[in-house]
């Protein structure tokens, strides 16, 4: 005798998270952005493991298709900060590094090292090598003697000893890292790649952000403004916080809840030829002063100036300070 599946005679209770998927996906006319409060509640459920895997995938891809709003990003960030058990540490710059480089070497790492030598306390964080063909910060920490920290205590020690610490996202927000790792399952990057740049988990004096795709920079700036953070958002080379000397740079800033904009003209009269290969030893040689190369010198000095601009120095002063820091750096690695 055949056993047939039981009939559903009573309507199942709706999952509490279903409302948020419905808000985002209810057709062209019915769908809308989440409010800041809804975003905070939704991300809170995700972080508390109260969401089914199918719901999470749908939620992330609907957000990606719609394009997240400043209010959503602010709400998501508030949910994470409310659950983040981070100590109180004195940090000048929050420096997210999630994109990886493919056209040029990561000169921003030398910029960060040079700033740290001069008393600027920098917290860097990243999400690992998620896309093939790119060079990620995590792969170069040992080469450049940048401390890899796996606990907040190690971060505090590294900041006190040398002013620079790198901590992987997986060690302080593992649920977010898991969502980033869905990239090769879902076929697209999720909004978490963008969210990670806004988080500023230690409440640094300024958060630096690089957003490559046009139109997103202002959204990120507005989200940081809603959170009361000081931040500068740029379209950095390859999506990393690194000024491209071959192009104009637009700075999207927010300070004290007020937005500001600044245009920085390109530094090089001619475009540089992209290197045929990314040779890590070239990074070390430039730091040690063994080779003269105009592109990295322009890029890293301008990137230092960007950071100093975020800490309150006007543009001309920031460039002068950056050039002095670079000229007087300790060239040992």
Q: What is the predicted function of each stretch?
A:
Residues 1-104, 116-118, 122, 269, ...:
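Acidic, glycine/proline-rich low-complexity segments that act as flexible tails and inter-domain linkers
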Residues 59, 141, 196, 304:
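Residue-level signal for inorganic ion chemistry
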Residues 90-157:
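A generic, well-ordered mixed alpha/beta core segment in the N-terminal half of proteins
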Residues 92-94, 120-123, 139, 147, ...:
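Structural motif
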Residues 127-129, 171, 236-238:
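Short, ordered loop/turn segments at secondary-structure junctions
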Residues 150-210:
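Phosphate/diphosphate-binding glycine-rich loops and adjacent basic-rich segments that engage nucleotide
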Residues 186-288, 293-297:
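A structural signal for small-residue-enriched, beta-sheet-centric alpha/beta enzyme cores
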Residues 300-311:
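Short, small-residue alpha-helix embedded
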């Amino acid at each position: 005798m055949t056993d047939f599946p039981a009939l559903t005679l009573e309507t199942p209770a709706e999952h509490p998270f279903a409302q948020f998927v419905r808000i985002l996906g209810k057709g062209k006319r019915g769908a809308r952005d989440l409010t800041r409060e809804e975003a905070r509640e939704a991300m809170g459920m995700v972080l508390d493991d109260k969401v089914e895997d199918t719901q999470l995938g749908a939620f992330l891809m609907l957000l990606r298709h719609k394009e997240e709003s400043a209010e959503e990003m602010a709400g998501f960030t508030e949910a994470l900060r409310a659950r983040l058990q981070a100590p109180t540490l004195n940090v000048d710059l929050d420096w997210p590094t999630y994109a990886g480089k493919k056209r040029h070497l990561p000169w921003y790492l030398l910029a960060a090292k040079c700033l740290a030598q001069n008393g600027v306390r920098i917290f860097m964080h990243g999400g690992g090598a998620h896309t093939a063909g790119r060079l990620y910060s995590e792969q170069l920490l040992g080469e450049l003697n940048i401390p890899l920290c796996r606990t907040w205590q190690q971060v505090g020690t590294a900041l006190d000893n040398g002013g620079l610490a790198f901590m992987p996202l997986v060690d302080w927000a593992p649920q977010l890292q898991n969502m980033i790792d869905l990239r090769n399952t879902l076929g697209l990057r999720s909004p978490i790649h963008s969210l990670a740049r806004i988080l500023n988990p230690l409440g640094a004096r300024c958060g630096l952000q690089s957003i490559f795709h046009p139109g997103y920079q202002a959204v990120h700036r507005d989200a940081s403004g809603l959170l009361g953070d000081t931040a500068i958002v740029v379209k950095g080379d390859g999506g990393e916080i690194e000024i491209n000397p071959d192009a104009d740079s637009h700075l999207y800033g927010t300070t004290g809840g007020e937005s500001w904009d600044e245009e920085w003209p390109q530094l090089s009269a001619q475009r540089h030829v992209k290197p045929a290969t990314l040779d890590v030893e070239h990074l070390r040689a430039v730091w040690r002063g063994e080779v003269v190369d105009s592109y990295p010198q322009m890029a890293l000095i301008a990137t230092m100036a960007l950071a100093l601009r975020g800490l309150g120095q006007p543009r001309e002063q920031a460039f002068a300070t950056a050039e002095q820091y670079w000229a007087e750096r300790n060239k040992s690695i």
